[in-house]
């Protein structure tokens, strides 16, 4: 029920090493004011709604279906939040959840681990985050990755994200690491807004004093200039955890950017990780998005095994889920990674996964109405 799209032999080796293990799920939430640019993201119908997307997703991830919410899931122009996919799996499989706040404007209403970060300024400023904070968030990531791997020796880690506007900060990181990602990234829109993203990234590079010429930049300085707080936390977590266990970076474009960041940090600093233990896991809607080029992007980064769940909503009874097949939403909150884990570690079929997701959507609407 999942497919390996790139670096097949490395990916197959990862499967052999970890398919008998169960998963631990960590979600790292953060915010960038890039997400408030009109039209940049479909993860929330308005810029105001997008301020609360990550907080609402976090609440649903932890609590599931409730009669009321501190922060209800924001309306989307089409489709439904990918957190329904994630919650369906973690709830039924009893997967432990760790929620990390890397930098939100408003703290989550559910229990979380505070990494003492802050929201990023819009990347167009060229001053997204203070450099000392980037180093501190990286150290927090190293600490927690090591701890999670030590506390769960018989598990692999799924590291997920929720950052609205994060595919645009991902494009800036990929570009700054010397990777040609032009027209290869994805978005929550059915047709990726490549031109808008590119103009935003170019403005950020100009204001940061960087030339837009695919010449690699120091990874920490790059995140400080045009990144977001989630990226550097997940990079730190994956680097330290990979020395002990398997790591699945659960996401599409955003996690490919994090993988590229990890490679750059390992290659240019004293920090050591085991790249053979790290894969990227996403959805078919990302991997096969014709308005981006995820597979070529993964190959440009190097030997990164790109996995994608083959979950299909064509036969779903719910129109909100069917919208995924038309290119809306696609991924987020580790949806693809959890769907892969359901198949890899818990032997779920496509039918069982679809049934669990539909039951959750049904219960949500029944109780909310």
From Swiss-Prot:
Transmembrane spans: none
GO molecular function: nicotinate-nucleotide-dimethylbenzimidazole phosphoribosyltransferase activity
Superkingdom of origin: Bacteria
Family, similarity comment: Belongs to the UPF0284 family.
Protein name as it appears in the record: UPF0284 protein cce_1085
